[in-house]
């Protein structure tokens, strides 16, 4: 494998055995591709905005005299960039401008004569744009639109599994679900009649729909039944015989023909009898007259002489009727063929319960069901029915729905109309009846072929269409009002409904979520999440067990592990690593094609529907060098079952062992040794890890760390290769390679880094360069690390030396004992940034003012404020300190004579204002790192605001001029090269000022042209610089668009440093979580023979019952990795020659049975080997991919190479006594995470505070500054102890005895420590509740 210069800095040893056929795809493509489809112009108009416009336009007036046509649209440029939007709290969006054409036709002239055409570009609101990382900035916060897994449009056949009716009879039903429009359901009732429901309303007999489609009873029976023909010959009844229909029947008379008896009366007719009848070619048999009684006629029979109806279609025949028919000359009688086995009389029975008999009555019946209480008219009933399923405006199956519909009905074509046809409805009824008759299967709703993904683009398009439809109504009204000659398209369109619909979706839809930004993994997982909840989806309460369960079709599409615990389990899932959506929105996963028993590298993506037809081998099947399967029988999956198949039956093979799991689960090493429940917790807890001060790569990883770190977008990645020309903490400049430059550009890439900004979860986002001056970089190399990344690899926690042993009860029940060294070295110290805002409003009594002049506040409290009343940057503040001084005018108060006197003497003291300053919340302390002041347009800016503006301007000017200098330097170096190559002497050239170089004339015409081109570029550069500077200045100095009534907002950012402490929650990656019980002095920790103490002591009892053995293997492998690092460290310290170092590191990389990774250190220069060794000092990082990881033997070999015991256990000594522990202890390195459940955020105390309105009891919870709940169990405990007075105090003065608690407060103030309990308020509430039941309870004084 070829490594770039940057990748050579640290190479992770990979234990994976299977070759990597397919690289991990870009992990955010589900979001980015979907939104791209929404906003890019699609010439076919199938997707996105184009499709929405085409479906609504052209809009015609009611009279048809004019129409508004759509021509094209374009998206403008956003006003602010992403960072500016976040700071200002606005939405990152672009204006949508649509070109519309108003066409007015001549009234009197023949149709289509155009009178006037006006075209104009119309503004249609703002469309939020997606950032490069797949998020949206809405009102200044980053949000993610989660994809939804919903039931695909189409037709579904299902049964109630015998649960509806008490008899346990299985009732079948069919449901046609459109993409938009009314649902159509067909269902059987326990009596086997077929009913129809529209939009899940009251049910009607299903034949009503057929009558409404203009079918007569005869035609209906003709559609659904085969016929049996009887003929009356010579006063005998002959029946036309189709032998196959007799199978399984019992003969009720002798079946004979030509004097030969085929079946005797009472015998069962078997296949042998049928073969005999077919062989002899028997077409008719004679039947007794009674046999026809009870049969059902298939058409109307009329007496032709009188015109009288003898027998209507669907009537049962009797012997009387037969006689009548025979008399009136009907010698041939057609009846319906039915039997109990596979030709039920369902439709015939349904026609009997159908109250309607013609089209109109059917339409009226449907109208009454849809619009109860409204008087039906013929026109209303007809238009209602037409609009339900046959109007393109109201009904759309969509391409997906039509494809699924036709596939379900086994039709050949998959394309077709978006509305239903007569045939569609009849075919669905036929298939439902076939299923009831025992032919065909019902569908599995949880199959991923019946559930599809709706991503951002599609949901945004639907919302946009909703807005457009609202506009359409208004435009229609406007077009009909006449007076069109003076109107332009602009006057008809009101953009409000559109922007409101879009805004509502992005701002408050259930699927538009506040981004989980704890660390890069939680961002990526959030964007790859798939939810079954949301509009048009399921609800938590109604979702049953089946929907939540893992389905065989989830394989390679949806992760079976990563899902929340709790009420949402199984409803919220995560996309598997390689999964993607196809054009219809179904999830598909890649497989390697197998041709004639040879596995090729050809990749096919299969959806769940297609996968059912193939036999698919697992990724860990053994192959020889040619790609043949080694074993004769291979474990494969087929139709959702797993079994053994011979190798020539195999069609496909999995691409990778980690194909099954999601990104989160693929980061857990030795996942294959963990119990599924614990793996679920491990995957979920990695997302809660807080980025530590110094990121530390995991010693034991899975090889996915780099992909996650790069794709998450928190790192700075090189867009093009080149050399590092300049680097400091906030900027990296790359001089681009010649071959990657665009013609006519300076060839300089500038990367500005993010410094100490706040994330959504208040953690700290900070980027640090990881390249040095002069280093070569290639496209895709990581230039700067973000939060939780280390040299371009995801690093969520720290590698800790752990021992599994009990330690004096301090690790009872998952508690964790931590060494003080961890605190001293700041291993788990995290930085949290809080944003506190102070809003100055315009009140009825006058404006609030931000000032340092606050009444009744001492000098000390104001010491950290400047003259504008805003805290200085860099000030250390603690709970209760004033950050922004603010006063609010208060109403005129009646003054006492004394106050009047004082006022008269000392002049007007500011007593008509009250202090409403922004203070630091209790329990928070930190450093002010930034202050932002936003002032409304037209309000005078204070001194601080002007200072900040000046600073920003300076910074912007500095940034831009530095950029200009860098670009100029690049340009002039190219100009110099042209001049020198044309023969100008370099020394003379360097003496000339650079500006004069461009004035030189060259004899060589080609070179002169080049020089002129470069001169042009130089002018353009300067012009661009002026333009950018002016734009920046305008942005900085313009007023801010604040909410109504707000004059000023001051935002203060506090950085809080949190060290690890008892009560913080920590976890490994295997679901092994615990709370820190004690920080132990270093000297008391257990230590080994070399005197090295352990960092963390974990309880060994946490392993066996939880079955997450992966943590033990990780610990052993971590120990080996560290051992090798220690040996490298020793060699570096002894300054051994590079050859020895190279040989040892090469041995470590080569270790392991047939591993895929080939590292050849002989191609590395000595410097590169030394730098690699330097990065391996703290341990050699190892990758053990999921389901393809290091084997036990390999771990032992690695331990041996690091001169460590192969058991992984060592002798430890007690730090307090120095005695040896009685048995060897498992010690090694485990990757531990600090989770975002910090004791500082949970610790809370209250003396007095707010009370609930009704019960007058203290509120609950830290956010409400609530009290501790003393619940019923706690009451029982005090009762059990007989602590009567304590209990009385708890239930009265400490809770809701209003008078008692005020008295008690007064007593304490007076120094009199006595209490008189009174009546608890909740007792009064109880009395009122009993009275509300009509029972009057009076309290009497004794």
Curated annotation (Swiss-Prot):
GO MF, any single term: DNA-directed RNA polymerase activity
Reaction it catalyzes: RNA(n) + a ribonucleoside 5'-triphosphate = RNA(n+1) + diphosphate
Entries under Pfam families matching the protein: RNA_pol_Rpb2_1, RNA_pol_Rpb2_2, RNA_pol_Rpb2_3, RNA_pol_Rpb2_45, RNA_pol_Rpb2_6, RNA_pol_Rpb2_7
Enzyme Commission numbers on file: 2.7.7.6
One GO term (biological process): DNA-templated transcription
Enzyme class: transferase
Keywords, in A-Z order: DNA-directed RNA polymerase, Nucleotidyltransferase, Transcription, Transferase
GO annotation, cellular component aspect: DNA-directed RNA polymerase complex
Family in the record: Belongs to the RNA polymerase beta chain family.
Subunit note: The RNAP catalytic core consists of 2 alpha, 1 beta, 1 beta' and 1 omega subunit. When a sigma factor is associated with the core the holoenzyme is formed, which can initiate transcription.
Protein's job: DNA-dependent RNA polymerase catalyzes the transcription of DNA into RNA using the four ribonucleoside triphosphates as substrates.
The name this protein goes by in its record: DNA-directed RNA polymerase subunit beta
Annotated organism of origin: Salmonella typhimurium (strain LT2 / SGSC1412 / ATCC 700720)
Lineage: Bacteria, Pseudomonadati, Pseudomonadota, Gammaproteobacteria, Enterobacterales
